[in-house]
Protein backbone atom coordinates (compact mmCIF):
# COMPACT_ATOMS: atom_id res chain seq x y z
CA UNK A 1 0.00 0.00 0.00
CA UNK A 2 2.82 2.40 0.91
CA UNK A 3 4.58 1.67 -2.41
CA UNK A 4 1.43 2.58 -4.37
CA UNK A 5 1.21 5.87 -2.45
CA UNK A 6 4.79 6.76 -3.41
CA UNK A 7 4.14 6.00 -7.08
CA UNK A 8 0.99 8.15 -7.02
CA UNK A 9 3.00 10.96 -5.45
CA UNK A 10 5.62 10.69 -8.20
CA UNK A 11 2.95 10.95 -10.90
CA UNK A 12 1.30 13.78 -9.01
CA UNK A 13 4.58 15.70 -8.78
CA UNK A 14 5.28 15.22 -12.50
CA UNK A 15 1.75 16.40 -13.21
CA UNK A 16 2.26 19.47 -11.03
CA UNK A 17 5.56 20.22 -12.76
CA UNK A 18 3.81 20.04 -16.14
CA UNK A 19 0.94 22.32 -15.05
CA UNK A 20 3.18 24.88 -13.38
CA UNK A 21 5.86 25.02 -16.03
CA UNK A 22 4.37 28.20 -17.49
CA UNK A 23 2.89 29.58 -14.29
CA UNK A 24 5.68 30.85 -12.03
CA UNK A 25 3.36 32.04 -9.27
CA UNK A 26 1.73 28.64 -8.72
CA UNK A 27 5.03 26.82 -9.04
CA UNK A 28 6.67 29.16 -6.53
CA UNK A 29 3.86 28.52 -4.05
CA UNK A 30 4.23 24.75 -4.51
CA UNK A 31 7.99 24.86 -3.87
CA UNK A 32 7.78 27.33 -1.01
CA UNK A 33 5.43 25.02 0.92
CA UNK A 34 7.81 22.07 0.66
CA UNK A 35 10.19 21.47 3.54
CA UNK A 36 13.73 20.08 3.19
CA UNK A 37 12.54 16.51 3.75
CA UNK A 38 10.05 16.79 0.89
CA UNK A 39 12.82 18.18 -1.31
CA UNK A 40 15.01 15.21 -0.39
CA UNK A 41 12.15 12.86 -1.20
CA UNK A 42 11.37 14.60 -4.47
CA UNK A 43 14.97 14.63 -5.63
CA UNK A 44 15.67 11.03 -4.70
CA UNK A 45 12.94 9.57 -6.91
CA UNK A 46 14.31 8.43 -10.24
CA UNK A 47 10.96 8.69 -12.05
CA UNK A 48 10.74 12.44 -11.60
CA UNK A 49 11.81 14.54 -14.55
CA UNK A 50 14.83 15.89 -12.69
CA UNK A 51 16.26 18.05 -15.46
CA UNK A 52 12.98 19.86 -15.93
CA UNK A 53 12.81 20.32 -12.16
CA UNK A 54 16.30 21.88 -12.14
CA UNK A 55 15.50 24.13 -15.10
CA UNK A 56 12.32 25.35 -13.45
CA UNK A 57 14.20 26.04 -10.24
CA UNK A 58 16.53 28.33 -12.17
CA UNK A 59 13.50 30.55 -12.77
CA UNK A 60 13.57 31.23 -9.04
CA UNK A 61 17.18 32.30 -8.72
CA UNK A 62 16.06 35.40 -6.80
CA UNK A 63 13.98 33.39 -4.33
CA UNK A 64 16.77 32.35 -2.01
CA UNK A 65 14.56 30.30 0.32
CA UNK A 66 13.74 27.83 -2.45
CA UNK A 67 17.24 27.76 -3.91
CA UNK A 68 18.77 27.28 -0.45
CA UNK A 69 16.51 24.26 0.21
CA UNK A 70 17.34 22.84 -3.18
CA UNK A 71 21.13 23.19 -2.94
CA UNK A 72 21.27 21.96 0.61
CA UNK A 73 19.07 18.97 -0.25
CA UNK A 74 21.18 17.96 -3.23
CA UNK A 75 24.49 18.33 -1.41
CA UNK A 76 23.14 16.50 1.63
CA UNK A 77 21.84 13.62 -0.49
CA UNK A 78 25.11 13.45 -2.44
CA UNK A 79 27.11 13.04 0.77
CA UNK A 80 24.97 11.03 3.17
CA UNK A 81 22.29 9.47 0.99
CA UNK A 82 21.89 5.96 -0.31
CA UNK A 83 23.83 4.95 -3.42
CA UNK A 84 20.92 5.83 -5.74
CA UNK A 85 20.39 9.17 -3.98
CA UNK A 86 24.10 9.94 -4.34
CA UNK A 87 24.03 9.15 -8.07
CA UNK A 88 20.84 11.17 -8.70
CA UNK A 89 22.11 14.13 -6.67
CA UNK A 90 25.47 14.29 -8.40
CA UNK A 91 23.70 14.06 -11.76
CA UNK A 92 21.55 17.06 -10.82
CA UNK A 93 24.44 19.00 -9.30
CA UNK A 94 26.39 18.64 -12.57
CA UNK A 95 23.65 20.72 -14.22
CA UNK A 96 24.15 23.67 -11.88
CA UNK A 97 26.70 26.29 -12.96
CA UNK A 98 29.95 26.26 -10.96
CA UNK A 99 29.57 29.88 -9.82
CA UNK A 100 26.20 29.11 -8.24
CA UNK A 101 27.29 25.94 -6.54
CA UNK A 102 30.82 26.72 -5.35
CA UNK A 103 29.82 29.03 -2.49
CA UNK A 104 27.05 26.72 -1.34
CA UNK A 105 29.45 23.77 -1.20
CA UNK A 106 31.85 25.83 0.92
CA UNK A 107 29.02 26.52 3.34
CA UNK A 108 27.23 23.16 3.44
CA UNK A 109 30.13 20.65 3.44
CA UNK A 110 31.55 21.91 6.76
CA UNK A 111 28.01 21.80 8.22
CA UNK A 112 27.63 18.18 7.13
CA UNK A 113 31.06 17.27 8.51
CA UNK A 114 30.09 18.95 11.79
CA UNK A 115 26.76 17.10 11.92
CA UNK A 116 28.48 13.72 11.64
CA UNK A 117 29.38 13.53 15.30
CA UNK A 118 28.72 9.82 15.50
CA UNK A 119 31.28 7.64 17.20
CA UNK A 120 30.91 5.21 14.31
CA UNK A 121 34.15 5.56 12.36
CA UNK A 122 32.75 3.68 9.35
CA UNK A 123 29.86 6.14 9.09
CA UNK A 124 32.27 9.08 9.12
CA UNK A 125 34.47 7.31 6.56
CA UNK A 126 31.42 6.78 4.32
CA UNK A 127 30.46 10.47 4.44
CA UNK A 128 34.02 11.74 3.90
CA UNK A 129 34.43 9.37 0.95
CA UNK A 130 31.16 10.65 -0.56
CA UNK A 131 32.34 14.24 -0.14
CA UNK A 132 35.53 13.38 -2.04
CA UNK A 133 33.47 11.62 -4.72
CA UNK A 134 31.18 14.62 -5.01
CA UNK A 135 34.09 16.99 -5.64
CA UNK A 136 35.67 14.52 -8.06
CA UNK A 137 32.56 13.87 -10.17
CA UNK A 138 31.74 17.58 -10.29
CA UNK A 139 35.28 18.24 -11.51
CA UNK A 140 36.12 20.57 -8.61
CA UNK A 141 39.82 19.76 -8.46
CA UNK A 142 40.81 22.66 -6.18
CA UNK A 143 38.10 21.83 -3.63
CA UNK A 144 38.98 18.13 -3.82
CA UNK A 145 42.67 18.79 -3.17
CA UNK A 146 41.81 21.17 -0.34
CA UNK A 147 39.53 18.62 1.38
CA UNK A 148 42.06 15.80 0.98
CA UNK A 149 45.04 17.83 2.19
CA UNK A 150 43.40 19.85 4.96
CA UNK A 151 40.73 17.53 6.33
CA UNK A 152 41.65 13.91 5.54
CA UNK A 153 45.45 14.01 5.72
CA UNK A 154 45.85 14.59 9.46
CA UNK A 155 42.49 13.29 10.68
CA UNK A 156 42.40 11.48 14.02
CA UNK A 157 40.45 8.54 12.54
CA UNK A 158 42.68 6.11 10.67
CA UNK A 159 40.03 5.21 8.07
CA UNK A 160 39.81 8.86 7.07
CA UNK A 161 43.58 9.26 6.95
CA UNK A 162 43.59 6.25 4.62
CA UNK A 163 41.30 8.19 2.27
CA UNK A 164 44.15 10.67 1.83
CA UNK A 165 46.54 7.84 0.92
CA UNK A 166 43.98 6.18 -1.38
CA UNK A 167 43.20 9.37 -3.28
CA UNK A 168 46.86 10.30 -3.51
CA UNK A 169 47.71 6.84 -4.94
CA UNK A 170 44.73 6.97 -7.30
CA UNK A 171 45.77 10.41 -8.54
CA UNK A 172 49.15 9.09 -9.77
Tell where the protein language model's regions lie, with residue ranges:
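Short, well-structured alpha-helical patches and their helix-loop capping segments
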Residues: 2, 81, 85, 104, ...
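Amphipathic alpha-helical elements of HEAT/ARM-like alpha-solenoid repeat scaffolds that form extended
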Residues: 16-30, 49-63, 84-99, 125-136, ...
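Short coil turns that connect the paired helices of HEAT/ARM alpha-solenoid repeats
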Residues: 44-48, 79-84, 118-126, 151-158
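Long, contiguous N-terminal structural blocks used for assembly/anchoring
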Residues: 1-80, 88
